[in-house]
C-alpha cells in the first residue's frame, strides 16, 4: 500500500471519521497522481489558490508549500476541523460552508478534487470569475461531456456552454483504486482556462430548450421547448430569419456556433421589438 493510503487511513482512524460517499468523500491516495496534479497546476509563490472539497488536506498541505496562499472550502464541519488541526502553516484559510453559496476570495488558480454531485453548478460558478487556470477532478463521464464534439453521444448542453467559456483539456484518468473509499466510477483530471467570453443573454436558455430533444430537428425541438426561453417573442417570430441549414439539423449535430447564432438572433429581435 502507498504511503498516502496509509496516512489517510491513520488520520481517519485517529479522529474516528467514517466517510460518506453521499458527500463525495472519496480521498485521493495515489501519490503519483497527486504529484501530477500539482505539476499541472504549476504553483508559484505568488499564486492564490482556491480549493473546493479539501477533505483532510491531501492536496492542501503540499499546495501550501508551493503557493503563496490557499483558501479551502469544506462543507463538512468535522472534516474541516481535522484539516485545521493538521495545518502547521499560516498561509491557508479554511472556510466551513457550501461552495455554491459562500463568497469566493480573490484567487488566480483552482485545484480541487471536486465533490462530483456538484460538478456542473460549481464549474459554472467558477467560470463566472476571472482566473488563470483550474485543475479539477471530475467523474470521467462528466469530463468527456465537457469536451464532446457535435455528433457524438456525449455532446450536450454542457459541451456547448463550456466550449465558449473555457479552454478545456482532459489531461489524465484515474481508476477507482486511486481513491479511498473506492468510488463506483472512474475519474478524470481536467484543466480549464477561462476564455473571457461573455455569453449572450439567451444562450443558456436556448441550450436548455434544444437539448431536451437532442435527436429531433432543431425547428421541432425549438417549437416543443420554446417555453424554456425567457422571451416575450413568439416562436414564429424567432423562427423567421433563422437559416434553414440550422433548422434542418438535428440538435446533436449543431455546432456550438450554430446555437450561438440562434441565441444572438433572439437577442437582436428582443432589442429591436
UniProtKB/Swiss-Prot annotation:
Residue pairs linked by disulfide bridges in the UniProt entry: none
Keywords, ordered alphabetically: Cytoplasm, Methyltransferase, RNA-binding, rRNA processing, S-adenosyl-L-methionine, Transferase
Major site of localization recorded for this protein: cytoplasm
Gene Ontology MF terms in the entry: RNA binding; rRNA (adenine-N6,N6-)-dimethyltransferase activity
Positions in coiled-coil regions: none
SUPFAM superfamilies: S-adenosyl-L-methionine-dependent methyltransferases
Entries under CDD domains matching the protein: AdoMet_MTases
Binding site for S-adenosyl-L-methionine: 26, 28, 53, 74, 98, 113
Stored Pfam families: RrnaAD
GO cellular component: cytoplasm
Keyword RNA-binding: yes
EC number: 2.1.1.-
Major enzyme class: transferase
Location within or outside the cell: Cytoplasm
Family to which the UniProt record says this protein belongs: Belongs to the class I-like SAM-binding methyltransferase superfamily. rRNA adenine N(6)-methyltransferase family. RsmA subfamily.
Function according to Swiss-Prot or TrEMBL: Specifically dimethylates two adjacent adenosines in the loop of a conserved hairpin near the 3'-end of 16S rRNA in the 30S particle. May play a critical role in biogenesis of 30S subunits.
Stated name of the protein: Probable ribosomal RNA small subunit methyltransferase A
Lineage, top ranks: Archaea, Methanobacteriati, Methanobacteriota, Methanomada group, Methanobacteria
